[in-house]
Amino acid sequence: MTITLGKRVLLTKEKIDKISYSLYLFVLVFAPPIVPYPHLFLTIFSFLMLVTTYKRKVWIVLKRSGIYNWVLAMGLLAMYTVCVPLPISMLCNDIVNTSHYISVINRYGVLIVAVSVCVTYLLCKTDRDGYGYEFLLESLINAGVIEGVCAALAFLFPGVKSIFIFFMKQFSASNLYSNTWYITVRSYGFASTLVDVFGLGAALIAGICFFYGITRKKIYMAESIVIAIATILNSRTGLLVYLISIVLSLLYVLQKGDIRKIISTFIAIGLLIIAGSKILDIMSTNEYTAGWFQAGIKSIQNFMSGNRTSNTSGDAMSMLFQDNFWKFPTFPRIIFGTGHSLYGAEGYAHSDVGYVNEIWLFGILGCLLLYGKIIEMCGMMKKSTRIPVFDYAAVFLLISYFFFNIKGAALGYNPGAVVMFFIIFVGTYQATSYE
């Protein structure tokens, strides 16, 4: 379908398709709560399309993309958890509140179902429509740009933020939108969650976008800045992930030795510094958000210089590295796991740290399977691909995942995990399709 005005072509079929793909990915990644659980509707729609329109293609896509093997690995991890850590916890009289187990099942179950179904559908549809990996990556970037614009509008116009907060409070499961401090200092954007995992997702898209800009299409270097606004306003950890992407991009082009791309990268970094300073100037107009951002910078500086404070409530790094946050199960349960984490488990001190929660949940044995599978998938993508952006993404995603897991659990249905697996499966599929 093409939309014209007289003899002038306004929108080609490809542009119309890119709009629809971009909106689809915006809902899949960020789950903007226009209605309750929008990702659920998306998953049901995608499943119905797979069993009707694409039923002959599904198995090929599942195998070539690596989705099938990932689902098997996660299923094996679930069986291990039910058969080993949980019975041991029953014998030790260490069964926690039922709501915690439900949240764990929801955390991993929704991620596996939504990502496997929706990414399979997108790959099937992309093949049928005759588009390649660039089309999907650019659609993902567009989804990030939409979120970046939403974040900027929410910061600049309080009325827009109030509308977003209304929907997020009504139709998302997070209680944070009833927290006066949180909605005053942060919560800029429109998504089911705007905490650190949101910042991780936005930073991953912005990082891929930056590299794509210096290696393929220059306009994406500018779009990278727009996407980064979402993480700057909501997640200091996400900003660090974005900085990692810039360093890795520079190292990548230096290693390849392409003078033109090296020059382009340094120019892009210079423009980023200028744009970043302007964004910080605008942020300073809101004393609460600016104060929160500056407190994070000061916390990192104090930590690096060894000046830890006993007042963890106002110091992010001191809170993160307090003893309670790094308490592991005793031997031998540290090996096998307990079947529950510390996040929301009654009778246990809370911890945000991803590694700590996952070792409590799965034990060292389960974590070897969990982390090993992620390393294997990224390694396979890097080994098999001939496309620079996926070669770069394999390293960037791995470093970002293991770095972020210090701050919080990266896995679960959230923007960070969805973006990571989307890129891995698209990258693996395009590589195996050319074999």
Language-model features, listed with the residues they occupy:
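Hydrophobic transmembrane helix bundles of membrane-integrated enzymes that assemble
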Residues: T2-Y288, A349-E435
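Rossmann-like dinucleotide/flavin-binding elements
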Residues: W292-G296
